[in-house]
């Protein structure tokens, strides 16, 4: 079973994708919060 090797490959590539997704989500959430704050004012 070569699960260890494939897992390493997936994790190294997957980590980058996950980080990018989290960054995008954080950015969108921040924009939404800023918009809400601006609308309140």
Curated annotation (Swiss-Prot):
It is found in: Cell membrane. Mostly expressed in leaves and, to a lower extent, in roots, flowers and stems. Disulfide bonds: none annotated. GO terms for cellular component: plasma membrane. Residues 10-41 are annotated as: Required for DVL/RTFL small polypeptide activity. It is a single-pass membrane protein. It comes from the Eukaryota. GO terms for biological process: negative regulation of cell population proliferation; shoot system development. The chain crosses the membrane at residues 10-29. PANTHER family: OS01G0525701 PROTEIN, ROTUNDIFOLIA LIKE 8. Belongs to the DVL/RTFL small polypeptides family. Small polypeptide acting as a regulatory molecule which coordinates cellular responses required for differentiation, growth and development, including leaves shape, pedicule elongation, inflorescence organization and fruit maturation, probably by restricting polar cell proliferation in lateral organs and coordinating socket cell recruitment and differentiation at trichome sites. This is Small polypeptide DEVIL 4. It comes from Arabidopsis thaliana (Mouse-ear cress).
């Amino acid at each position: 079973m070569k699960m260890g090797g494939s897992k390493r490959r997936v994790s190294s590539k997957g980590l980058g994708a996950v980080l990018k997704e989290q960054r995008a989500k954080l950015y969108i959430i921040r924009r939404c919060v800023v918009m809400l704050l601006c609308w309140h004012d």
